[in-house]
Curated annotation (Swiss-Prot):
InterPro entries: Cyt_trans-like, Pantoate_ligase, Pantoate_ligase_C, Rossmann-like_a/b/a_fold. (R)-pantoate binds at residues 58, 150. It holds the Pfam family Pantoate_ligase. HAMAP family: PanC (MF_00158). Belongs to the pantothenate synthetase family. This is Pantothenate synthetase. ATP binds at residues 27-34, 144-147, 173, 181-184. The reaction proceeds by a bi uni uni bi ping pong mechanism. Its EC number is 6.3.2.1. It is found in: Cytoplasm. NCBIfam families: cyt_tran_rel (TIGR00125), panC (TIGR00018).
């Protein structure tokens, strides 16, 4: 496995690459969810590139940038064992300059749900993903469905900026008890982790209601909020694949989303129906 930190060096290294490139951008603290992305990339491409970059521009003031889990050596070993060809490990000053050009998230889709409570978050996400895609120039880039709003906005960016990359969505990986894997799970105390299971339980209950023929969003959301109590709920929402709120679930075109906090730890989860 080759490790590169300089963006220009990586661009030069890949400049004449004829093999198909699969790319997985991460912020490190890799887990089974990231491994699933790597495996999918290896199935579909001849060369796999993983980036590890804790992007400061997607964190708001007072958020967990400084305490975000850092496991650099473990991450290197995971990538090596998974057969990653290139690990891109850039520094902040290699990605961002003093006179920075940034992307702005769409006025509607980028500022609802997670974007409402974190108003500049998706500006930072889109900017760094755009930079990374321009450096690596992959055929395909891989993102988890757990971060559904992020996935939607990145797909929209790629489409509207006429970028030649396929965005591949990979199913959420869960613990045996249903908790969606997240690097932030490391923050949870044992008691908080037990409480966090209410998130997956609420989504299973919503799915069961739909299977019984209950499609009314208001009824489903009310039931989910009851299950989630007393968690600190940022939002429970039912949207279509364009992230417009739905009054009724549309099978094949719906995402049910939850964001809730336990202490200072925010957890996201969703189900695609």
């Amino acid at each position: 496995m080759k490790i590169i930190s300089n963006p220009l060096e990586l661009k030069e290294y890949l400049k004449d690459e004829k093999r198909s490139i699969g790319f997985i951008p991460t912020m490190g603290a890799l887990h089974e969810g990231h491994i699933a992305l790597i495996k999918k990339a290896k199935e579909q491409n001849e060369l796999v590139v993983v980036s590890i970059f804790l992007n400061p521009t997607q964190f708001l003031k007072g958020e967990d940038l400084d305490k975000y889990p850092k496991k650099d050596e473990a991450d290197r070993q995971i990538c090596k064992l998974c057969g990653v060809d290139i690990l891109f490990f850039p520094h902040v000053d290699g990605i961002y300059g003093s006179d920075e050009v940034s992307l702005l998230a769409p006025k509607i889709r980028g500022f609802v749900l997670e974007g409402q409570s974190r108003p500049s978050h998706f500006n930072g996400v889109l900017t760094v993903v755009m930079k990374l895609l321009n450096i690596v120039r992959p055929k395909r880039a891989y993102f988890g469905k757990k971060d559904a709003q992020q996935l939607n906005l990145i797909s929209l960016m790629v489409k509207q900026l006429f970028m030649s990359v396929e965005i591949v969505a990979v199913d959420t990986v869960r613990e045996k008890d249903g908790l969606a894997l997240s690097s932030r799970n490391a923050y949870l105390t044992p008691a908080q982790r037990q409480e966090a299971l209410k998130i997956a339980t609420s989504l299973r209950s919503a799915t069961a209601m739909v299977m019984r023929g209950i499609f009314d969003s208001e009824l489903i959301i009310a039931n989910m909020r009851e299950i989630l109590s007393p968690l600190d709920i940022s939002y429970v929402a039912i949207v279509n694949r364009e992230f417009t709120e739905l009054k009724r679930v549309e099978i094949g075109n719906s995402v049910i989303l939850v964001e809730a906090s336990l202490g200072s730890t925010r957890l996201l989860d969703n189900i695609w129906l």
